[in-house]
Amino acid sequence: MTTQADDSSIKPARPYAGKSAQERQNARRLALVDAAVRLFGEQGFSAVSIDMICAEAALTKRYFYEAFASREALLTAAYESVTREYFQAILVKMTPHMADAPKLVRAGLKETFGFVRRNPVKARLMMVEAMNVRGQLGDMYGARYDDFVELLLQVTRPLLGRQAPSDKVFRVMAKAVVGALIHLCQNWIATDFAQPVDELVEGTERLFAGVGRELGVRGYN
């Protein structure tokens, strides 16, 4: 004789320490990402094992594989976390100056170098280690680079003069400027931040000003 299961016996996972099962799972995932940012940024992706990440996060391997299929998947999540934090930081500083190109550029540059200096481990992951592990990051690296280029295009377009180039040429110019800024940050990190921030900001401001005059950006002509 078969009996029908009583629906009342099927209970959701009970809260533990005031947190639901999903909240605890999210917290474990975040702990793994934070651990990966620290270790990948300090030691490099190739030198860090899953065991090291779990030890840093104070979690077992069971919880690693609950959240990520592989070390490469965690690398992608760590890189995305840091780049998202950086973009949010520069947008906060740039947003009040969207109608004033020189102030907009200065705010963005000061926060870029400021973010790198305040967060050297995150900056190494985002600016240096990411270059070394582009193969493991897959499309993520190119996508975030393109996001940076697109941000520059979006904030510049409303300020363009009549002699603006075609969109394709404009995009090449934006990629060149972004590439120069990333390379400068990489060199700054490699020299242990030897050059003062004010000099970096002034030098890159002049670069942006030259591009701005070429484009006829209001405030530079």
Model regions: which residues?
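Amphipathic alpha-helical segments used for helix-helix packing
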Residues: 117-136, 153-156, 186-187
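N-terminal intrinsically disordered/low-complexity leader segments
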Residues: 1-27, 216-221
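Hydrophobic alpha-helical connector segments
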Residues: 77, 92-121, 201
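Solvent-exposed, amphipathic alpha-helical segments
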Residues: 31, 35-43, 85, 89-93, ...
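Secondary-structure edge/capping motif, primarily at the C-terminal ends of alpha-helices
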Residues: 93-97, 126-130, 159, 188-192
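Amphipathic alpha-helical packing segments from all-alpha helical-bundle domains
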Residues: 84, 88, 135-161, 171-183, ...
